[in-house]
Amino acid sequence: MASIQSDGAIVALGGRRIDAEPTLTPRFPFDQVSRVGMEISDRLRRSYAVVLVCSAACGVDLIALNAAQKMRLRTRIVLPFLAVRFRETSVVDRPRPEFWGSMFDRVIGVARANGDLVELNADGRDNAYSTANAVIIDEALKIGRCQQRRRASGTSPLIALVVWDGASRGADDNTKKFVKLAQESRFRLENNYKGCGNGARAIKRRECRLQ
């Protein structure tokens, strides 16, 4: 269990959703969930994380939130719109909806009870998820400033944990946008998900690791 210290790292997280099935370009297949979860837990411990800020889509978000809450870290969740709507569009719309739906309900319940659920009013906007990315970064910065005011000196480390394959899908790739926002805000971009890559080689190897 991670110790909860006021001077620990603030981690903002972004990453891939679980793959649709079938998919031509594997990025995050379900058979990697357990391993990625263990690696995220290890990264949070080694970073001395005390707060995780992210969204709650099926895939990296929910895996990280589940791991962080098991470690009794504070988890602040940012959704682009109301949780009930987000659950439909970004959680149970992929394979194994029961698995992801129950995990979503659990982590959202904890965040809501602690006053750490942020539901934006961006439903219907083309940039709803980009807006959520910006708020995730902003919330992490705010928490860092609050911790700094409680301390005599020093600053809390701001880490952007990005769990993805490293290959942009194009201009609408929200993970790539998250990376850019984190860099512009001077977060330490600590980890990348060098995952399933593209094409036949990816289908054959299925290697997903945090590097």
State where each predicted segment sits:
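Acidic/glycine-enriched connector segments
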Residues: M1-Q211
